[in-house]
Amino acid sequence: METIMHEKYLLILFYSGTGAVKNLAHAIADGAEKESLAVKIRTVPKVSANTEATEPSIPESGEVYCTKQDLINCSGLALGSPTRFGSMAAPMKYFLDSTGELWANNELEDKPGCVFTSTGSMH
């Protein structure tokens, strides 16, 4: 069986409604690149009130949407979302909820990670 080697990279996955979390994501990318780390910046599409995707699978502009393969192949993960009433934004939760089989198969095991957020409220 042939093993496919992938380039090591830090996956910076974020959702941003107003741009604050996007700015943090790019600041993290700048810092990682200064340390000679390869970086992939990805986002997730918006969802409707019924928590279903409301945007095309390929964005017309801006960051590329994250795929499960991006998560599988990353060497580390930085995850960012605005905080809304003490929780992450619905589009990020919707995406993460779709990755249950990655968790069940330990696809992210031994990969360092961090989270970042921005909020305008106390919680």
Language-model regions: role of each:
Residues 1-108:
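N-terminal beta1-alpha1-beta2 submodule of the flavodoxin-like/Rossmannoid cofactor-binding fold
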Residues 109-123:
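Short, glycine-/small-residue-rich phosphate/pyrophosphate-handling segment
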